[in-house]
Curated annotation (Swiss-Prot):
Alphabetized InterPro entries for the sequence: CARD, DEATH-like_dom_sf, DNase_TatD-rel_CS, Leu-rich_rpt, LRR_dom_sf, NACHT_NTPase, NLR, NLRP_HD2
Native source organism of the sequence: Mus musculus (Mouse)
Keyword Glycoprotein: yes
Domain CARD: 6-104, 106-200
Domain spans labelled NACHT: 273-600
Any matching Pfam family: CARD
The protein's name in its UniProt record: Nucleotide-binding oligomerization domain-containing protein 2
Residue span of region Required for CARD9 binding: 221-254
Taxon lineage: Eukaryota, Metazoa, Chordata, Craniata, Vertebrata
Length: 1020
């Protein structure tokens, strides 16, 4: 970018590159931008008034950059060229600045000389501002108040130097002459601070520390250390953008690699510093950060950062004492052995070379707020205030911060301070296979596991989350030895891993073959101790446990030896390392296990798992309402009291596990845990009735349909977790009862984070609907495996909307196979996915053989002319289709000709979209011939092509002989006034046309006014 921008010579070229220049000016730190201003001021490109307007504190950097471009533009070619020179000078900041030109310490114009030599003087003052302030104050040139204003801790050393020079420019008491004389006497600037031995020593120590922490992966396993380098597998990392910002041709979210994390595209707030990575529990967020740390520490990537400071939110919340930014970085991450002040000052002066990572905001018990502002890097404050001000940019502005979290913990307020949001969606199909092959290099083992997973639909759906792939890997022997009864639900998987750990801890000669009564009874006390610890931890938002907390829960060394508790990295140097569960989901599982089997758990107290007061009107606030005993009071310290305090997203996971444990399938296991038959039946019956009742209550809250429209339901927050809980119980009769009276025509589940596992749960419940429904699952993570999981419920679907779901040709073929057997399924929307010509045969078969099919939308995929030709053959045999969407593909003229030839004779097609398909005049000519013959088409969308005037001439001729088309859309097609004139002539003979869209074509303002006045149907 730099070379292309710096080659510009005219104002027109300068203006054409404006967006690149803005990106260049804001790509570095505020220090870099202010250095550019120094050069422009020293060359008199900027007046003092210009400079002050561009240096207003608190202005977003992007705003200042645009104002600077406007200012130099108004100064002509010379100003534009000088800006580019200033950018080059500021970027070449590694050389030693020298005071240049004549230098008269007794100059008659000291203020002018200070300005002429400003870049060099700022650099020379860098390490001497404090000394210069003292000299100036003692000499009577500055007041104490003025010195304190310059010393404010929010300013860097360079900014303090600039403020001193700015003050000298307006004071008439000789300060400018004083500075000229004393700056000349200062020693030449030292090499840049990060080249100094002290900084290099700290960087080396920091790299070593980060490398030590990131080399081995022990997130899910305490019994062995796995080398991250050997087993790391890329996850699906998608860039989240605001829906609709890219118009009709908006593509699916970009899938990025880890190395793309800091790219400049997809900004939600360009002036923010924080990159947010969201993902469900077990999707691999912590491992992704660990990989980032490893790549930096080994020098293979992210070397634009000199410093990386990694933090865990679950450990930060354990810090009780007030702390400053300096304390956080040095005492809670890495301590500089020498020159602590110099190192810290460098961090403040060069925040753009610093990266801070904060893992697991969802495990931070304090909710984000912007009410308490803290801008001092040296004054102590609470840990939550420090973290929140770092994320907002009030501290270490322009330092990059990467934050991970589960989605539910991210508020709209926090998103205001997010520069880029990315979603971690777990493994792709290829990722699952690669992960298992990396874990099992023995001949044939990985192949057998992969075959087992692919043959077991429910297990396949679970494995897209890395935590489940890890479980499958750990339990591969148990899975491969089983001939039936493979895990179906999340609860099944966690019971399988429980069995694996129990068997591993048992003597070899006494180990039973499965998770039988004897195995559970032998370690029941351990499981209850772990469950009690887990439940109390959830109540206090505590995920790292001290020795005192372990003792209070009666967890001893024998319990720890089972392997579910592992050592956490100590957040306080020198203290004994605390323990944590392998993963937050294990903590939730053990809490649910405790609630299911503990003799202390009353039936009434289970209600509080689902009706935590803070959930308000959400799903969980209405779940299990009839468990409440009127007039009962919550006993302090009881399970009910503990559950009232737990975080909602952890309650959701715990609720699903509890439903699974109370299922009929696991009744014998709970009985083996010494739960009486009567108590067990009570808990199961209550859970079943309340789950069904809660879902009905959820459905009853749906407002009535608008007269003349289908009754629609948009899922409320938490609805998916209610469905998951029903699925975990695996009782068909319960699912049937839950939806028996649901009376809707459209079920909308957009942006609900629906993956393959959620698809299985939805299908399990929705297959029992009494009336057909249109199912909308846009903007989720269904994928090909999720499509497979939806099979059971497709028979009750009239329409299926799967926009932006990472579906490939394989998933499309599955859908077609089902649609051909499902009489009621009449509409498919698969735009913004990964379809290619390879699925065209299936689509053609669907059109040819399903004569009640109404709508097929496959826009924004990767279909070419070859695919369009195949699909056209299927359309030739179809008589029912009304809507065909092909926008955003690459069918070109050849594909358009094939489609047009078939559409010409179609008797029912009402709407055809070929937006953005690289269609030229030949394709337009074919469409014109189609218009002459077709008697049904009402809307033809051809925006974003290159039809131009020649193509419009053909279309105009077609319009003269057409009497049904109402809307013709030709925006952004390179059409001139001559083409519009041809359309006007056609319109004079066509009264059926209501609108012709011509926006974005090559008309002058006068031509637009003329054309609009001649026919109002032209939309310009």
């Amino acid at each position: 970018m730099r070379s292309s921008c710096c080659d510009m010579c005219s104002q027109e070229e300068f203006q054409a590159q404006r967006s690149q220049l803005v990106a260049l000016l804001i790509s570095g730190s505020l220090e870099g931008f202010e250095s550019i201003l120094d050069w422009l001021l020293s060359w008199d490109v900027l007046s003092r008034e210009d400079y002050e307007g561009l240096s207003l504190p608190g202005q977003p950097l992007s705003h200042s950059a645009r104002r600077l471009l406007d200012t130099v533009w108004n100064k002509g070619v010379w100003g534009c060229q000088k800006l580019l020179e200033a950018v080059q000078e500021a970027q070449a900041n590694s050389h030693t600045f020298e005071l240049y030109g004549s230098w008269d310490t007794h100059s008659l114009h000291p203020t002018r000389d200070l300005q002429s030599h400003r870049p060099a003087i700022v650099r020379r003052l860098y390490n001497h501002v404090e000394a210069m302030l003292e000299l100036a104050r003692e000499g009577g040139f500055l007041s104490q108040y003025e010195c304190e204003e310059i010393r404010l801790p929010i300013f860097t050393s360079s900014q303090r130097a600039r403020r001193l020079l700015d003050l000298a420019a307006v004071k008439a008491n000789g300060l400018a002459a004083f500075l000229l004389q004393h700056v000349r006497e200062l020693p030449a600037p030292l090499p840049l601070p990060y080249e100094a031995a002290e900084c290099q020593k700290f960087i080396s120590k920091l790299r070593t520390m980060v490398l030590t922490q990131s080399r081995f992966l022990s997130t899910y396993d305490g019994s062995e250390n796995l080398c991250l380098e050997d087993i790391y597998t890329e996850n699906i990392l998608e860039l989240q953008t605001e829906v609709g910002t890219a118009g009709a041709l908006q593509k699916s979210p970009a899938i990025l690699g880890l190395e793309d994390l800091f790219d400049t595209h997809g900004h939600l707030n360009r002036d923010a510093d924080t990159i947010l990575v969201v993902g469900e529990a077990g999707s691999g967020k912590s491992t992704l950060l660990q990989r980032l740390h490893l790549l930096w520490a080994t020098g293979r990537s992210f070397q634009e950062f000199l410093f990386i400071f990694p933090f865990s939110c679950r450990q930060l919340q354990c810090v009780a004492k007030p702390l400053s930014l300096r304390t956080l970085l040095f005492e809670h991450c890495c301590w500089p052995d020498v020159a602590q002040d110099d190192v810290f000052q460098f961090l403040l002066d060069h925040p753009d070379r610093v990266l801070l990572t904060f893992d697991g905001l969802d495990e931070f018990k304090f909710r984000f707020t912007d009410r308490e502002r803290h801008c001092s890097p040296i004054d102590p404050t609470s840990v939550q205030t420090l973290l929140f001000n770092l994320l907002q940019g009030n501290l270490l502005k322009n330092a990059c911060k990467v934050l991970t979290s589960r989605p539910d913990a991210v508020s709209a307020l926090l998103r205001k301070f997010v520069r880029t949001e990315l979603q971690l969606k777990g493994f792709s199909e290829e990722g699952i296979q690669l992960y298992l092959r990396k874990h099992h290099r023995e001949p044939g083992v990985a192949d057998r596991l992969i075959q087992l997973i692919q043959a077991t639909s429910a297990l396949h759906g679970l494995c897209h989350l890395p935590v489940f792939s890890w479980m499958v890997s750990r339990c591969h022997r148990e899975l491969l030895l089983q001939n039936r009864g493979f895990p179906t639900t999340s609860t099944d998987m966690y019971l399988l891993i429980l069995q694996h750990f129990l068997l591993h801890a048992s003597p070899p000669d006494s180990s039973p073959l499965g998770l039988g009564p004897g195995l559970l009874q032998s370690r029941l006390s351990t499981l209850l101790h772990l469950g009690h610890l887990a439940l109390r931890g959830l109540a206090m938002s505590c995920y790292v446990f001290s020795a005192q907390q372990l003792q209070a829960a009666q967890v001893d060394s024998d319990d720890i030896s089972l392997g579910f508790l592992v050592r956490a990295q100590s957040s306080v140097p020198g203290s004994k390392a605390p323990l944590e569960f392998l993963h937050i989901t294990f903590q939730c599982f053990f809490a649910a296990f405790y609630l299911a089997v503990s003799a202390d758990t009353s039936v009434a107290s289970l209600k509080h798992l689902f009706s935590c007061g803070r959930l308000g009107s959400s799903l969980l606030g209405r779940l299990l309402p009839n468990l409440c005993i009127q007039g009962s009071r919550v006993k302090k310290g009881s399970e009910a009291a503990l559950l009232q305090k737990a975080e909602p997203h952890n309650l959701q996971i715990t609720a699903a596990f509890l439903a699974g444990l109370l299922s009929q399938q696991h009744r014998d296991l709970l009985a083996a845990c010494q739960v009486s038959e009567r108590v067990l039946l009570q808990r199961q019956a209550r859970a079943r009735s309340c789950l069904a009742h809660s879902l009905r209550e959820h459905f009853h809250s749906i407002p009535p349909a608008v007269p003349g429209e289908t009754k629609s339901m948009h899922a409320m927050p938490g609805f998916i977790w209610l469905i998951r809980s029903l699925y975990e119980m695996q009782e068909e009769q319960l699912a049937q009862e839950a939806v028996r009276r649901l009376d809707i025509g459209h079920l909308k589940l957009t942006f609900c984070r629906v993956g393959p596992a959620e698809c299985a749960a939805l299908a399990f419940v929705l297959q029992h609907l009494q009336r057909p429904v249109a199912l909308q699952l846009d903007y989720n993570s269904v994928g090909d495996v999720g499509v497979e999981q939806l099979r059971p419920c497709l028979g009750v679907c009239t329409a299926l909307y799967l926009r932006d779901n990472n579906i490939s040709d394989r998933g499309a073929r599955t859908l077609v196979e089902c649609a051909l057997r499902c009489e009621q399924l009449q509409k498919l929307a698969l735009f913004n996915n990964k379809l290619t010509d390879a699925c065209a045969c299936s689509m053609a078969k669907l059109l040819a053989h399903k004569q009640n099919f109404l709508s097929l939308r496959v826009g924004n995929n990767h279909i070419t002319a070859a695919g369009a030709e195949v699909l056209a053959q299927g359309l030739k045999s179809n008589t029912s289709l009304k809507f065909l969407g092909f926008w955003g593909n690459s069918v070109g003229d050849k594909g358009t000709q094939a489609l047009a030839e078939v559409v010409a004779d179609h008797q029912n097609l009402k709407w055809l979209s070929l937006v953005g398909n690289n269609i030229g005049s030949m394709g337009a000519e074919a469409l014109a011939l189609m218009l002459e013959k077709n008697k049904s088409l009402e809307e033809l969308c051809l925006e974003e092509n290159h039809i131009c005037d020649e193509g419009v001439y053909s279309l105009a001729e077609g319009l003269k002989r057409n009497s049904t088309l109402k809307f013709l859309k030709l925006s952004n097609n390179g059409i001139t006034y001559r083409g519009a004139e041809a359309l006007l002539q056609a319109l004079s003979r066509n009264s059926a046309i209501l609108e012709v869209w011509l926006r974005g074509n090559t008309f002058s303002l006068e031509e637009i006014q003329t054309l609009s006045s001649r026919d109002a149907r032209l939309l310009l």
